[in-house]
Regions:
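Active-site cofactor/cluster-binding pocket
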Residues: 1-170
Length: 170
């Protein structure tokens, strides 16, 4: 998710992007992490001290990383797995449920989330993210992931109609 989003923002939109990641043995369903720093200017330090946006695809990740979110930051959760949010201010979609029911593969959850994020982030465009998927994924799994992306994007457009207009930078 982080790599594809970062690639799309850097290559397709011209932003400066750095990514750091931590994928331990808990990577499936646990608190793995990918940090992106995105800026229109060169980046001085590659790791964020506080987060403008947090994507929590598991309860453990939400619990562990929420405290790093700025007071004005935005929280996006997979409502299939995150049932207790530390704030009432969040966006959410049942990403795991969408992946299971519409794609037939729970491993597509992160790409469903990417589709949803593309709707809510004003600086991400669907065509750019699709090209990023094409550039980063093997051909044998591309079609399935494009379907997952579209499912997440369309569901977010339906359930979060205001999308990017809700975003403000601090």
């Amino acid at each position: 998710l982080g790599r594809i989003l970062g690639h799309g923002l850097a290559i397709e939109h011209g932003y400066y992007v750095t990514q750091t990641q931590s994928y331990g043995p808990e990577a499936r369903g646990g608190a793995s992490r990918a940090d992106l720093v995105v800026n229109s200017q060169p980046i001085n330090y590659p790791k964020p001290e506080q987060l403008d946006f947090l994507v929590a695809l598991s309860q453990e990740a939400c619990n562990r990383y929420f405290q790093r979110l700025k007071p004005t930051g935005r929280l996006f959760v997979d409502t299939t797995l995150v049932t207790q949010t530390p704030s009432n201010q969040f966006w959410g979609l049942p990403c795991t449920e969408i992946a299971r029911e519409k794609i037939g593969l729970v491993q597509a959850t992160n790409i469903v989330a990417l589709g949803a994020l593309t709707h809510v982030l004003p600086f991400a465009r669907p065509a750019a993210m699709k090209r990023s998927l094409e550039a980063n994924l093997p051909a044998k799994i591309l079609e399935l992931n494009l379907k997952a992306f579209t499912a997440g994007y369309n569901q977010a457009r339906k359930d979060i109609p205001d999308g990017p207009t809700q975003w403000t930078f601090s």
